[in-house]
């Protein structure tokens, strides 16, 4: 006899008056079990669109300067060291901001945390139009770059809105379409500059006015998040805390369980050489092609844009691949997928540094490299939601922050000053990708196994997630959401577990928002 699936799918939860609360099918944790890309169904898909669009706008703001760097460089008299320092500043600002954002998501929710961060960093974008010195350029890039911490709220949001079989895809699309801003801005800013210049502005004035476009985009996105976003399927954090439907956790507990989970540290390291590499390329690729192959500003922008624009399918593709591998091989499939794809990306990065003698070969390899390194980002956040439930936000922040740390270190070591030629730095960066992906082999979940070792006999997901709660907290039912997540994650054990595995239940599963 065929076993019944453990995850309970509900075609819209009945609310007062017998009307369905959701237009989308949900599981017992009220998370959507489907992903309707072109829908705006609230709260799941509306929050998805707010998450990726706000992150997209932050990416546009952060990398609005590099496409206009030849003009900014001449106006402000920037040296190679100034440019390198500013590039480092643009990605270093978000290191601690991402950790803070993860904690804020755990404590106050992704909606308020995201909108607050975006509004606080928007003035720096507008100030880009009035800078007069290299130090001013460095400062605006630093403070604008802090907005990249909105990535953490986007990933936390998707992990809160979509069930385990769809979380990799949701995280991949939200992150990928957000990162798309890094490519779109390579086209946008030169076009805006040209339009303003043709109207009659001098080059000195035109590039300054152009910065108002990313500033306005960022302002609008923050307002949209507040107006249309929702923290959780059951409501916003404030409401859920007041009604007692959600346990209000303490910072100390959230921090302790995040810092003591070694899986989060490994993912932070590997993400440092997937997303961190992507940030580094966003900073150097435009100038590299402009100087190395003597192309014009628009052509260099088009080439650089092709790297970032690949995110429209590459990172979502990584998330989709993670979910597909999970459906066949469970968590072990997700881990193998991450290691394989990121390692191939490292090899292609080495090749990119070697073929610098050929313009056509460099462009072709860069495009191929972009697909693999960005897909690795999607595969990473196909795993992150399963590391911890109590400290999901901070684990996401640690991983995201690792991406920025990787970018800072890589840019400082290989692209700062004149120690290495850019093509040599790219080659060494590829070797770092390969080396820093190896620790994925050490990630092990007792209930699901790891890359090289199977699961421990008798271990369950419920047991794994409940360890984050004390006996007293479990008695009060504070771990109810973790238990529901464990039950809905049964397929992470592979096909045999998904088809026949019946995890132990200690907390009744229902469709209420309690404990969400």
Swiss-Prot record:
Pfam families, per the entry: MFS_1
Membrane-spanning ranges: 52-72, 76-96, 112-132, 142-162, 172-192, 209-229, 265-285, 299-319, 335-354, 367-387, 395-415, 425-445
Keywords of this entry: Cell membrane, Membrane, Nitrate assimilation, Transmembrane, Transmembrane helix
Expression across tissues: Expressed in the stelar cells of both primary and lateral roots, particularly at the site of lateral root emergence, root-shoot junction zone, vascular tissues of adventitious root primordia, leaves, germ tips and seed scutellum.
The keyword Plastid is annotated on this UniProt entry: no
InterPro entries (alphabetical): MFS, MFS_trans_sf, NO3_transporter
Bilayer topology: Multi-pass membrane protein
Signals that turn on the gene: Circadian-regulation with a peak in the middle of the morning and at the end of the light period. Isoforms 1 and 2 are induced by sucrose in roots. Isoform 1 is induced by nitrate in roots, but not isoform 2. Isoform 1 is down-regulated by ammonium, glutatmate and aspartate in roots, but not isoform 2.
Record's miscellaneous remark: Plants silencing isoform 1 of NTR2.3 have impaired xylem loading of nitrate and decreased plant growth at low nitrate supply (0.5 mM).
Quaternary organization: Heterotetramer composed of two NRT2.3 and two NAR2.1. Isoform 1 interacts with NAR2.1, but not isoform 2.
Similarity comment: Belongs to the major facilitator superfamily. Nitrate/nitrite porter (TC 2.A.1.8) family.
Name of the protein in its database record: High-affinity nitrate transporter 2.3
Organism of derivation: Oryza sativa subsp. japonica (Rice)
